[in-house]
């Protein structure tokens, strides 16, 4: 069995290999065969693609996903709720004060929320003072309302950032998603009209810290860039790449699913909306390092096989298999026809499954048709077995299969799995149990005289007061009339008493009071 890296081809230039790593390279185009001497044999350089003459290598820097980049990009933020706290006091006739606190809501403005958050983060003492409820005022026989507008800051409130469309995902958002957060709109609406969500960092792009700068070698032909050798030493082709933005950064999605940002003059189409990229983690890096090491080892094996051919002056099908180009592109093909060593110019393409080149028994598909054999011999060590089956020295690599499974399982979902938004803020005021209040202004409202009675009691009291006043007026008028009648009678009696005199039998004149008194005494 050929080592695992032999079957791993990092260059994906064939459209059918979209997002997959090939397990083999087969001839796509084959030139005429010509006999050669064993001294014309050579080992291919599988670390550099000699495709379309792109042999000019130059150092350059590019940007890729960070190693260890996780699936969910967490973005810290806070929620801001507008709350109006109302303290209502009533002072009754005897001076007893009753205080009632009420709470209402209003929709805050982003600027006010940002200022309140900065107060809290800066440790401004005014923020601590603003956390208190409004101090209630009171007046005798009056209802006094003291109101304070508050900005309730709940921090932190973490949301998941989708790197593809820069949308945010959290249970606090309507339908669990917030789109369009940018410089012009720095907040998200939530499940409540009076609450908004804002990122802690107003510059959303800085929160998407998933990129790193790397150094590599660019393979170009004139002004056209064919591919590049990455920092791990593995060549990556730009054929089949498409443009894709991650967190607002424009880059290229390569055929193998990796994402890079690099300057190129090539005209590239945009990726389909459902196109994803592969994660860049330690496991994929480790496999890539193993592949590079294996490719280097395979070249050493090829050189050993070539040395053995030169030494023994003999060639076998097994030794010829070492001379096969392991990456897509232009190269050489070798075979042995009638004990004659043959060579041909060839172009290799990648193969995703063995069924692509082995559709049926005895058929080796090359260029869309079954390739003819010469006395059971094809090329690059491929022969026809005694049972009629095509025998390929290389078998599918377990390392490659592991890498393919890694790619299939490490893609970023466009929609993050989130809990049901209806489970958040069921009663509307649950968030207020964990609030931090920013209270800017206090407003007082003083009512008129209030006796503290309900509406029907007020009407009864007014009716009783009016009836009492009417009775008092009638009583006063009656008293006044009686006084006016008694005053003339008293005046006449007082005038007669001063002028009348009584002459007793003794001839002594006495006053009427004395005569009345004496007469009384006489009657006794």
From Swiss-Prot:
It is found in: Virion membrane. Glycans are attached at residues 56, 266, 338. One of its GO terms (cellular component) is virion membrane. The keyword ATP-binding does not apply. Keywords: Disulfide bond, Glycoprotein, Lipoprotein, Membrane, Palmitate, Signal, Transmembrane, Transmembrane helix, Viral envelope protein, Virion. Its main location: virion. The chain crosses the membrane at residues 460-480. Changing residue 27 to P: In strain: ERA 2007. Glycosylated and palmitoylated by host. Glycosylation is crucial for glycoprotein export at the cell surface. It is a single-pass type I membrane protein. Residues 1-19 form the signal peptide. A lipid is attached at residue 480 (S-palmitoyl cysteine). Residues 20-459 are virion surface. Disulfide bonds join 43-302, 54-226, 80-113, 178-188, 208-247, 242-271, 363-370. Residues 481-524 are intravirion. Arg-352 is highly involved in rabies virus pathogenicity. Its mutation dramatically attenuates the virus. Attaches the virus to host cellular receptor, inducing endocytosis of the virion by using different host proteins including TFRC, GRM2 and ITGB1. In the endosome, the acidic pH induces conformational changes in the glycoprotein trimer, which trigger fusion between virus and cell membrane. There is convincing in vitro evidence that the muscular form of the nicotinic acetylcholine receptor (nAChR), the neuronal cell adhesion molecule (NCAM), and the p75 neurotrophin receptor (p75NTR) bind glycoprotein and thereby facilitate rabies virus entry into cells. Homotrimer. Interacts with matrix protein. Interacts with host TRFC. Interacts with host BST2; this interaction inhibits viral budding by tethering new virions to the cell surface. Interacts with ITGB1. Interacts with host GRM2. Belongs to the lyssavirus glycoprotein family. This is Glycoprotein.
């Amino acid at each position: 069995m050929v080592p695992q890296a032999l079957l791993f081809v990092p260059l994906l230039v064939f459209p059918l290999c979209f997002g997959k790593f090939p397990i083999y390279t087969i001839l796509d185009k084959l030139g005429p065969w010509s006999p050669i001497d064993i001294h014309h044999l050579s080992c291919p350089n599988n670390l550099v693609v000699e495709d379309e003459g792109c042999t000019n290598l130059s150092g350059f820097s590019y940007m890729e996903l960070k190693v260890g980049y996780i699936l969910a990009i967490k973005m810290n933020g806070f929620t801001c709720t507008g709350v109006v706290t109302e303290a209502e006091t009533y002072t009754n006739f005897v001076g007893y004060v009753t205080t009632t606190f009420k709470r209402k809501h209003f929709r805050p403005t982003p600027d006010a929320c940002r200022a309140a958050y900065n107060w809290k983060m800066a440790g401004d003492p005014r923020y601590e003072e603003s956390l208190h409820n409004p101090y209630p005022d009171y007046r005798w026989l009056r209802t006094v309302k003291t109101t304070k507008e508050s900005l309730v800051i709940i921090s932190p409130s973490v949301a998941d950032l989708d790197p593809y469309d820069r949308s945010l995902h959290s249970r606090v958002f309507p339908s669990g998603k917030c789109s369009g957060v940018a410089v012009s709109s720095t907040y998200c609406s939530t499940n409540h009209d009076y609450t908004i969500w804002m990122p802690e960092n107003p510059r959303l792009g800085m929160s998407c810290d998933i990129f790193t700068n790397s150094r590599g070698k660019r393979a170009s032909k004139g002004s056209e860039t064919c591919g590049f050798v990455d920092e791990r030493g593995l060549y990556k082709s730009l054929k089949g790449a498409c443009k894709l933005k991650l967190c607002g950064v424009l880059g290229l999605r390569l055929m193998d699913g990796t994402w890079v940002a690099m300057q190129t003059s090539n005209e590239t189409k945009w990726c389909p909306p459902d196109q994803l990229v592969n994660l860049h983690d330690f496991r994929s890096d480790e496999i890539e390092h193993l592949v590079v090491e294996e490719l280097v080892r395979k070249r050493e094996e090829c050189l050993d096989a070539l040395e053995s051919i030169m030494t023994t002056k003999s060639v076998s099908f097994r030794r010829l298999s070492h001379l096969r180009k392991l990456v897509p592109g232009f190269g050489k093909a070798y075979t042995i026809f009638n004990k004659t060593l043959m060579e041909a110019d060839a172009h290799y393409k990648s193969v995703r499954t063995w069924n692509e080149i082995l559709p049926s028994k005895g058929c080796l598909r090359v260029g869309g048709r079954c390739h003819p054999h010469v006395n059971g011999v094809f090329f690059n060590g491929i022969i026809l077995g005694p049972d009629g089956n095509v025998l390929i020295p290389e078998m599918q690599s377990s390392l490659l299969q592991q890498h393919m499974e890694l790619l299939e399982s490490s893609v970023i979902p466009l929609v993050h799995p989130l809990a049901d938004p209806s489970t958040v803020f069921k009663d509307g005021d649950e968030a207020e149990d964990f609030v931090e209040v920013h209270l800017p202004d206090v407003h007082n409202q003083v009512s008129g005289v209030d006796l503290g009675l309900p509406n029907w009691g007020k009407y009864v009291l007014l009716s009783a007061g009016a009836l009492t006043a009417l009775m008092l007026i009638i009583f006063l008028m009656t008293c006044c009339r009686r006084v006016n009648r008694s005053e003339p009678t008293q005046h006449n009696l007082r005038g007669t008493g001063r002028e009348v005199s009584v002459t007793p039998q003794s001839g002594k004149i006495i006053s009427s009071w004395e005569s009345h008194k004496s007469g009384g005494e006489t009657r006794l």
